[in-house]
């Protein structure tokens, strides 16, 4: 609203300059016209500019999984602002630029790249569309017209690993990881390190999957492998649902608040929530104060959230999480500090050293204790055709 009043004041000042200062003072001549009888007729017009429009580009369908929850965050943040938002979903990396063009033609001066899979393309495409301001979710480095917004879900994964191990009888934990999710490798490693705080020699079996059919096969394989607790870090909601069907204890990376009470095997869940960040972006856009900066979502600022433990968890699980949360928030959990070895036993980091955020984000290796069971992702032979339908 403040920006609207500023625009009205600016318009009034411009009118004063056009008519002369005297014409804006009380008692002087206004912009009145006379009708055929000579009676003065005052014409008063108020010009209001349209609110800014922000377009979102989603990699997956907004009807399910993490993308559905991210879309809900878009809508909830917009409810508290004057910003209009719209989106295109199911956009592949190759169609990303086409979606940018479509949203630009729709009047979007701001575009949210709402998946880390676009990060490798965003820099070059943003440089071709300097009239557009971009917000890259899952991006760590900003540039002239790109606001970088990333998060550290591995903080929550550390807690998930501890919870999984404490509730395991076999000391064998499974994790289904979607490589397209933010920092999938650090998430697996953090979960393994958390697990090892409970059982030093425990094993974390990792299976990679994305689509519903793939994650279902991954869960089945982990159960066959002897894993009695499974951590789900996937876009798909099918991972958690399959665990529930099999009666296997699990931890979800999706917000289960709406139906947690009906999930008999759920231990806890953790989520990455950009709602408050998006609201702050909307406000800056409305006030014309937006600049391309950087944001990192953590447990401390409420972007990364860890739920209370659920009834399926053992007694004492909540005590572990409650003791860990303050340390995660103040940075004293030291997840990736001290000696770290990879799966071959090679020392990657020495004692009294700590990985930087940049080192963590770019991890391509797994810590000792992680075994890769299989990659259940199938090659994509035919990319779906996107018609760039814009929805509100």
Regions found by a protein language model. Name each.
Residues 25-28:
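Bacterial signal peptide processing site
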Residues 74, 159-202, 206, 294-314:
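An alpha-beta-alpha
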Residues 53-80, 86-93, 116, 180-185:
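Extracytoplasmic "Venus flytrap"
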Residues 149-172, 270-290:
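Hydrophobic alpha-helical segments within soluble ligand-binding/sensing domains
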Residues 56-57, 108-116, 135-137, 225-236, ...:
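Periplasmic-binding protein-like
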Residues 20-23:
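C-terminal motif of bacterial Sec signal peptides marking the signal peptidase cleavage site
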Residues 290-392:
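Segments of small-molecule ligand-sensing domains
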Residues 127-150, 256-265:
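Flexible loop/hinge segments that line or gate small-molecule binding clefts
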């Amino acid at each position: 609203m403040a920006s609207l009043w500023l625009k009205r004041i600016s318009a009034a000042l411009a009118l004063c300059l056009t008519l002369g200062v005297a014409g804006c003072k009380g008692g002087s001549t206004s912009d009145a016209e006379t009708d055929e009888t000579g009676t003065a007729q005052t014409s008063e017009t108020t010009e209001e500019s349209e609110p800014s429009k922000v377009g979102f580009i989603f990699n997956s369908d907004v009807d399910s999984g993490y993308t559905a929850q991210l879309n809900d965050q878009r809508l909830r943040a917009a409810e508290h602002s004057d910003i209009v938002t719209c989106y295109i979903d199911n956009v592949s990396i190759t169609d990303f630029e086409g979606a940018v063009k479509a949203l630009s033609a729709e009047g979007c001066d701001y575009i949210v790249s709402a998946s880390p899979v676009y990060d490798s393309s965003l820099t070059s495409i943003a440089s071709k569309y300097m009239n557009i301001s971009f917000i890259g979710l899952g991006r760590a480095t900003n540039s002239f017209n790109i606001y970088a917004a990333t998060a550290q879900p591995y903080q929550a994964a550390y807690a998930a690993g501890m919870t999984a191990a404490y509730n395991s009888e076999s000391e064998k934990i499974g994790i289904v990881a979607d490589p397209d999710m933010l920092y999938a490798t650090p998430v697996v490693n953090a979960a393994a390190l958390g697990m090892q705080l409970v059982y030093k020699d425990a094993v974390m079996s990792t299976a990679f999957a994305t689509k519903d059919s793939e994650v279902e096969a991954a869960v089945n394989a982990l159960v066959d492998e002897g894993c009695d607790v499974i951590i789900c870090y996937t876009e798909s909601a099918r991972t958690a649902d399959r665990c529930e069907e099999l009666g296997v204890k699990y931890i979800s990376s999706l917000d289960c608040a709406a139906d947690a009470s009906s999930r008999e095997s759920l231990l806890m869940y953790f989520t990455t929530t950009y709602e408050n960040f998006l609201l702050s972006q909307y406000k800056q856009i409305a006030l014309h104060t937006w600049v391309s900066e950087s944001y990192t979502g953590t447990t401390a600022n409420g972007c990364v959230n860890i739920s209370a433990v659920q009834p399926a968890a053992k007694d004492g699980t909540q005590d572990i999480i409650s003791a860990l949360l303050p340390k995660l928030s103040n940075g004293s959990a030291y997840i990736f500090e001290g000696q770290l070895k990879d799966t071959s036993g090679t020392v990657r980091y020495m004692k009294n050293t700590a990985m930087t955020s940049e080192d963590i984000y770019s991890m391509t290796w797994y810590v000792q204790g992680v075994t890769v069971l299989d990659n259940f992702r199938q090659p994509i032979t035919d990319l779906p055709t996107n018609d760039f339908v814009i929805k509100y």
